[in-house]
Amino acid sequence: MADEDQYRGDDQIDEEEEETDESGYKTVKDAVLFAIEVSDSMLTPRPSSDSKKPAEESPTTAALKCAYYLMQQRIISNPRDMIGVLLYGTQASKFYDEDENSRGDLSYPHCYLFTDLDVPSAQEVKNLRALAQDGDESKDVLKASGERVSMANVLFCANQIFTSKAPNFLSRRLFIVTDNDDPHGDNKSLRSASTVRAKDLYDLGVTIELFPISRPGHEFDTARFYDDIIYKASPSDPDAPAYLQTDSKASPATGDGISLLNTLLSNINSRSVPRRAQFSNIPLELGPNLKISVSGYLLFKRQAPARNSFIWLGGEQPQIVKGVTTQIADDTARTIEKWEIKKAYKFGGDQVAFTPEEMKSLRNFGDPVIRIIGFKPLSALPFWANIKHPSFIYPSEEDFVGSTRVFSALHQTLLRDKKAALVWFIARKNASPVLGAMVAGEEKLDESGVQKFPPGMWIIPLPFADDVRQNPETTLHVAPEPLIDQMRYIVQQLQLPKASYDPFKYPNPSLQWHYRILQALALDEDLPEKPEDKTLPRYRQIDKRTGDYVLSWADELEKQYAKISAHGPKSTLVKRSAKDRTSEVEDAAQKPYKKVKVETDEQGVEDVVRAHYQKGSLSKLTVPVLKDFLNAHGRSAAGKKADLVERVEEYLEQK
């Protein structure tokens, strides 16, 4: 993606240096290569396991559709990811510049590279869609070969594709979709060669994931061949971690590969943002002359539609606009050079100018560091103190050998004693320091044993006093105990499964709609009619679970209201006649009445406010006077009295 800084002026960039700069983050780019077997059994249509879609479909076609949907999603959500489709077992052969019409022997016979491993273009997505929908091209490509295909050849072909197209990617995965659990039978040489090629892929950093498809009357048995070529653990990467969770669950021997692929797509559809390396190898000071090295990652970040570039639509074709900022003098309209611009602050009514070097020194609070100041019990950390996204830190052995051992000891101690460390935290050069709470986090696994959150430390930035606002004064009304007891049954019925909220199951509906529109425009598809919103309550399910309890609660509410009304104070109002009201009006007209003095003179308001400002007693002024002063000077008069006083002080300090 284009860098957003190129569309902003230099002065704007300087003013925002204190904000989190994400341009230096290491994004985890993903490269996925589908290896789909084309055989007679894979091309045979089978009844769908989904009762809503009873149409028969071959496993090869279903796998191609899954690859198409994945490519369709990634082209918008993760535009830097690479996806490729390799068909093996085909009658035709194609690999880069080679095909069956080429001279000489083929490097990889019966391997057809339909989509090269690259960032998918709109045309490649359309071609894959045509193949998955039984187009004219599928009749020529999807023809099974009568010869046996060597899995060693397929794995070596995948090795060359990853090496040439994605040599530096942090996440590389090979998805094998097949229904043949023993491709080589008793041929020990081919089995041994396949094991060697799989080990080469593992050493390269490629994760092989199998999506087995059971045949009718025959369950897929991974122990016959694939247990020897698939490693359970992902290859470790010292530079950056892999994804928090794998996109597909572990494939059981009796699992259906297509259903697993559909699970993969449903997980990816949440468009989770890759983890970002926030900083690398900064010292964690535990005490005087005791330092270890840690790296930090941004695991959670709010994702929103971002403008990558401005588009000019005034010509025949839309063009990307390159932003240029020019400073012009207000009085002479002369172009001002960068060296003529100086930054200044007002002190006591005078402007004090600073050189660029002095400005940098003002912002320099020291080198990046995480310094432990002390320890506090976890109970002293309130829930509302988490106001910004936390940083996840993990030990690094690059600068200080033994960092992992010390980090682990500190992590276990904080967990055991239920304490948090108070730290002085500077993430990068020229970054503003923050006081943070370093909290130890345990490893969390899902029901299938896949890691959801790794073990490590979390640094939570704590708010300063200016960041904490006072809650508005409210009167607490407590419901009667019988009413609370009835509501308890309703809440118990509405709890989520296992009483836990999984954010990956509820994607942002507005963001999904934004991506869907972009996807339709890029692929020349029909615009969708309405967005899919998984956050909407399931009203029928709610009514089924809690309908009777809600009616019982409503009956109890009527009973409690009747009790309160019966014991409430009786009204002492007496209806008066029209004659009484007329006499009161006449008496009021004869009596003199006091008028409230209202200050309407703007100069008078100005003098009063300035006098109180000199005495430091602006808070003693009434809200109408403060609002009149702000309105007279074109300032906003909305908000509470404290906000009005603050705006008045800001205005008078500038004068």
Curated annotation (Swiss-Prot):
Its EC number is 3.6.4.12. SUPFAM superfamilies: SAP domain, SPOC domain-like, vWA-like. It is found in: Nucleus; Chromosome, Telomere. GO terms for molecular function: ATP binding; ATP hydrolysis activity; damaged DNA binding; DNA helicase activity; double-stranded DNA binding; telomeric DNA binding. It catalyses: ATP + H2O = ADP + phosphate + H(+). The keyword Cell wall biogenesis/degradation does not apply. Belongs to the ku70 family. This is ATP-dependent DNA helicase II subunit 1. It comes from Aspergillus oryzae (strain ATCC 42149 / RIB 40). The gene is ku70.
